[in-house]
Amino acid sequence: MRKGCFGLVSLVLLLLVGCRSHPEIPVNDEQSLVMESSLLAAGISAEKPFLSTSDIQPSASSTLYNERQEPVTVHYRFYWYDARGLEMHPLERPRSVTIPAHSAVTLYGSANFLGAHKVRLYLYL
């Protein structure tokens, strides 16, 4: 009887620990552009971010395209990574841009860190 109760309590605790994880979008290390599927449904496409390094600070740009007949507001954030692939903190604040109908907009971001070697752009509605 005691073994059965102990096993049941262990199972419940294991399930609760598994439920505690935060939902995340699975991302490959080489994936520099992450778009939520709702953007594609809204007629938005994007180019991978282009990373430019200079003596002053790294910067990145990416062009977004709106293929629809109405403007679409897109939220975005650039994530910066060091030479070892570690995310650099503090994170940039999320920003927004409204892309006019049948138009393109170029997003620009600058790393506030001298050691940034990689960038990832996250886009969502």
From Swiss-Prot:
Domain of life, source organism: Bacteria
Alphabetized CDD domains for the sequence: DUF1425 (cd09030)
Example GO BP: DNA damage response
InterPro entries recorded: DUF1425, YcfL-like_sf
Protein's recorded name: Uncharacterized protein YcfL
Organism field: Escherichia coli (strain K12)
Lineage: Bacteria, Pseudomonadati, Pseudomonadota, Gammaproteobacteria, Enterobacterales
